[in-house]
Amino acid sequence: FCLSRGLGDVYKRQEYGVGIFEAFPTKSALKKALKKGYIKVDGVIASTATLISGGEQISLDIPLETTTKRSFALPLNVLFEDDYLAVIHKPAGIEVSGNKFKTLANALPRNLEPSSLYDATIPQPVHRLDYATTGIVLVGKTASSIRALNKLFEEKKIDKTYYAITIGTMKRNGRIETAIDGKPAQSDYEVMKSVPSDRFGFLNLVNLHPKTGKRHQLRKHLFSIGHPILGDKDYALDGLILKGKGLYLHAYSLEFEHPFTKNPLHITDGLPEKFGKIFHGKGV
């Protein structure tokens, strides 16, 4: 639904709606509730086109059966957890969320302790990793925490570090600013180690800091400078695709200020074993 005064743009209208109902901490969740007819204005089912100007009675009615949700039995490594948020390890070969049952999001209730806070909700990831990418994922456990963590990402107050193994002879460090889908994007990199490879010339362990958050940003950026990530089937050079061993891209750490306790958090998720094998004489 929309305000007819005061908040002129769509983004602010959606933010207003999210602020009303703590059961729906994100704009996408609010839209789903509207589509399912859970929200009424003055007793009439609302839609995204419903206008409000002040003084209306807005109500939420969720059928009881929709509050229960099957959880996916996938054991997860929990790296950090409190009543507000959690940080978990995402294995390769699973979606973070989406319209499937076997997702990381659906496995969270079995792996996390229920929050004792008043606005506790079903745990939700607040960002995504690609299907083949491993590593660290941040999760909100309360409605207010999910909103606060989303805001930290929007304001670029969460520092993300990735590691990848790339192909070819690279400069020691650099900044990639190739636009993605016509929009500015920036990634900083530093080569930590390099080893010769009969098939690939050189393989490099690269530390990566994405400064923007575009879809497939690191994969596209490294491909754009001629040094694709090992195992990447979508962004690869002819004849240099490694099959059967997955994508060598790992979300290594997150650093940010806890939005409620204000404690600094720096949480890491160690490199997969397959990364180390390349640099200890076993190759690929």
What are the functions of these language-model segments?
Residues R5-K32, E190-L203, H221-V284:
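Pseudouridine synthases involved in rRNA/tRNA modification
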Residues S47-L51, N207, G246:
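Short, surface-exposed secondary-structure edge patches
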Residues R5-Q186, K274-F279:
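RNA pseudouridine synthases
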Residues I167, H209, E257-P259:
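A generic structural motif
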Residues K36, D42, T212, F260-T261:
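Residue-level recognition of short loop/turn positions
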Residues L149, N204, K214-L222:
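Short beta-strand segments enriched for Tyr within beta-sheet-rich domains
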